C-alpha cells in the first residue's frame, strides 16, 4: 500500500484540479466570454448578398451597414460588446468563431448567417 499523498487518490485529485485550469484556457482560446460585434441584417437574402458585394469591392463595413442593414444602421451596425447567451444560436456561434478584424480589412461571415431575424453579415472587432 503506497504512503498517503504519493499516488493513490491524492494524485488523482491533483490531476483533476489541474485539468480545470486547462478548461479555462481552452475557453479563452475559443473566444472568451464576450465579443465586440458589428453586423448587417437584411430580411431578404438578395439584399444581403448585394451588401456583401459592396464589402468585397472595398466599401467600409460601417458604410455598407448604414446603407443596407435593417437593424442599428445609424451606428454602422455596431452592436457593442455581446456576451455568450445574449445572442441567437447561429449568430453567437459565428461571432465567437470569427477572428478579430478592422473596419478597413474586415473578416466577416461568408455566406451570411441565417437566423429568425433574417440574414446577417457579422464582423468581430474585439474579444475579451
UniProtKB/Swiss-Prot annotation:
Its EC number is 5.2.1.8. It is found in: Nucleus, Nucleolus; Cytoplasm, Cytoskeleton, Spindle; Cytoplasm. The keyword DNA-binding applies. The keyword Cytoplasm applies. Belongs to the PpiC/parvulin rotamase family. PIN4 subfamily. This is Peptidyl-prolyl cis-trans isomerase NIMA-interacting 4. GO terms for molecular function: DNA binding; peptidyl-prolyl cis-trans isomerase activity.
Amino acid at each position: 500500500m503506497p504512503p498517503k499523498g504519493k499516488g493513490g487518490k491524492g494524485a488523482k485529485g491533483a490531476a483533476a484540479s489541474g485539468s480545470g485550469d486547462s478548461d479555462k484556457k481552452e475557453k479563452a482560446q475559443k473566444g472568451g466570454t464576450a465579443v465586440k460585434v458589428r453586423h448587417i441584417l437584411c430580411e431578404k437574402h438578395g439584399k444581403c448578398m448585394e451588401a456583401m458585394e459592396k464589402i468585397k469591392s472595398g466599401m467600409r463595413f460601417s458604410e455598407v451597414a448604414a446603407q443596407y442593414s435593417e437593424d442599428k444602421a445609424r451606428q454602422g451596425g455596431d452592436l457593442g460588446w455581446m456576451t455568450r447567451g445574449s445572442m441567437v444560436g447561429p449568430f453567437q456561434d459565428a461571432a465567437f468563431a470569427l477572428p478579430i478584424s478592422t473596419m478597413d480589412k474586415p473578416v466577416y461571415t461568408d455566406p451570411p448567417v441565417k437566423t429568425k431575424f433574417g440574414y446577417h453579415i457579422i464582423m468581430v472587432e474585439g474579444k475579451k
